[in-house]
Amino acid sequence: MKYNGPCADTAGSAGEGLRKKGGTPMRKRNKVVSLLLAGCMAAGLLAGCGSSGEAQVATADNATAASTSTGAADSAAPETAGEVDGQINLRTVSFGNNFDVQDMGWRWMMAECYEGLMRDVADENGDRFEYAGAESMDVSDDGLVYTFHLRKDAKWSDGQPVTAADYEYGWKRLLNPEYGYSYSFYLFNVVGAEEYYNGQGSADEIGIKAVDDYTFEVTLKVADPTFQSKLVATPLYPTRQDVAEAAGDQWGKDWTKCVYNGPFAMTNLVEDNSMTWVKNDQYWDKDNVKLNQVNWYCVAENATAATMFDNGQLDVFDAAGDYIAKYDKEVEAGNMQTMTTEYPGTMVLCYEQSEGGKSGLMKNVNIRKAISYSINREEMVSAVYGRYTAAYGFVSPAITLDGTSYRKQASETMKEEYEQYAGDADKLKALFQKGLDELGITDKPEDITITLLSQGSATENQLEREYLQQSISQNLGVKVELNTVGDYQMFANERDNKNYDIFVGGWFSDYNDPLDFLNVMKTGVYDSYGLYSNSEYDSLIDSLTGENDNAKRLEIYQKLEDLLVAQDCGVAPLYYSDKHYYYQNWVKDFYTSSFGASQELYRATVEK
C-alpha cells in the first residue's frame, strides 16, 4: 500500500508479537491502519461506543434509503462511549471515498465490509492466515495451480450467493487495462494476465476461472512463494459483475450502488464527517459478529480526538508525543489499557529524480546523500513524534522471511556511511558541494533553494516539515522552501507535475515478504516515489521470478536494498512505523492485523 504524503497513520505487526498492559484483559491483533489519502502522523483509528438507536439490517434496498438520512444528527459528536452496548465509534482523519475493492489501496477502512478468500489474523503469537470466503485450498505438486473451494453459505448483503464467478470477474477486472488499477501487477504471474493487461491477449486466456459456482481455479506461470500471502489483499476480493456494470461510471464512487459480503454493510455517509455501518445479517458468520453498529467520525486534529477520548466519546486513541506519557499514567492507574505493535510500513524521503526537481539537483547521488545524511533520525522520531524507530533500511522490521524478521537477517548498510557524516556540518557541506561540482553548478549553497512538498495541518505535520527544513538548511547551508498544500489531491497534482525536490512518503506492505517493499521501486511499477530507475535493480527484481529458495531470495533482497538505499540513495529511509493504542476498559476483542483489512471489528464487543 503506497502512501505519498507528509506523514501517515500506521499500525500493526507482522509476526513479531505485541505488547499490552493495564485495564481489563483483552485479546489483540497487531495491524495496520494506514492513511492513504490523509496525512496525520499519529492520528488514525479511534474506537468507541455510543450513539443510540436501533441498528438496521443492511441490504441493497435500505442502503439507498439510508443514504438520504443525513441531517443534524449525522454531524453530531458521538454520545458518551459505553452508553450503548453493541455500538462502537471509530475516529479517522479521512474517508477514502472509493468503494471499489479492486482500487482499495486505502484498505484501512472499508475492507471490513468485504471479504476475500482468506483473512489475516493476529494475536499475541503473531500473524496467521485463516480461511474466510474459501473453506479450503488445493495446490498442485508443481505449485502452479491453486484450487479454492468456496463457502456455500457466503452471501452478499442483498441475499445473493457469493460465487466463483464473482472472484473471476473481480480478478479479471483488476487486470482490465481499461481501468488501469495500480494493483494489477499482483496478478502478473498468472498465466495470460500481464499479456491481457498490456493489450496483447484476451480475458479468456487468463488462468483465472470459475470451474463451477463454488470452485475457483488460478494457474500461475511459475511457482511463487508470495502468492498465498497476497490472498488477503483487498484488490483480490470478489466483485459482483451485475452490480458493477449497473453502476457504470459511478462504480466505486456512489456507495449506495454497492453490495457487501463482509461482516458489516455501509448504510450512511456524510462526506468528511461521519459514516455508519451495521451488522450484515447475510454474512455467513453473523452469529459470531457481536457489534450491531459501527460509527466512524472524521476528526483531523489529534488534540480534538484526545479531548473526545478523555470525555469518553471515543474509546481508542493512537497516541504520539506528550500523549504517551499522559496516558501511560492512566494505564498504571488501571483506568485504561494500552498496546504497542509494529506495523509493516516505512516512511522515506523521496527525491524528484527524473528531471532533478525544481532545483535541478536531485539527479545527483551525492546531493541526495547530503540531504539524507543531514537528517538525524533518532532525534526526529523523539522530538517530532515521541515514537517510531529510526530507519536506515527500506524494508520494515515487521516483515518476516522464513518466520524471522527480515531486519534481523539483513543489515542496514546505509548506516555505516551515514555515521561518517551525521552531525558534521562541514563534511555534509563538502558532500553537497561535490554533487554541485559533478553537475557543473557554480551557485553558492546559500543561493540554492530546495523545495519540500507537504500537506496536512495537524501539529505533527507542521513539526515534521519544520524539522526537515531546519535540519537540511542548517547542515547544508541552503534555503529550504515549504510548498504546503491543503489536501491530498492538491499534493498529488504538485507531485505528479514534479513541482518539488523532496517530499515524505511511505510504503505499507500488503503481504508479508520483502518483495512487496522492494518491487515498488522497480522502474515503472510506481512512478510516485520520485521516479527512481536503475537497470541493475530491475534485473535483480526479475531474477526473483521462479526463485523459491529463501536463502537465495534473502541474498537478492539484501543486494536490492543496498543498491536502493546505500549506493543510489533512491529514497532516504526516515523511520519504521508502529501503533501505540490506548483503550477504554469497556472495549473487548478489538483486533488489528498486519495485512488485508486493517482493522478487524467482527469479534469486537462493547460492554458498559
Label each region the model flagged.
Residues 372-407, 460-470, 493-608:
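Detector for C-terminal structural segments
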Residues 163-170, 213-219, 223, 262-263, ...:
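Alpha-helical secondary-structure segments
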Residues 271, 422-509, 579:
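Ligand/substrate-recognition segments at binding pockets and active sites
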Residues 168, 182-242:
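Surface-exposed binding/hinge segments that line
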Residues 91-141, 259:
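N-terminal lobe/hinge region of extracytoplasmic solute-binding protein
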Residues 249, 282-328:
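Ligand-site clamp/hinge motif
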Residues 389-435, 457-461:
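Structural transition elements
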Residues 122-124, 213, 220-289, 293:
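Gly/Pro-rich hinge or "lid" segments in bacterial periplasmic/extracellular proteins
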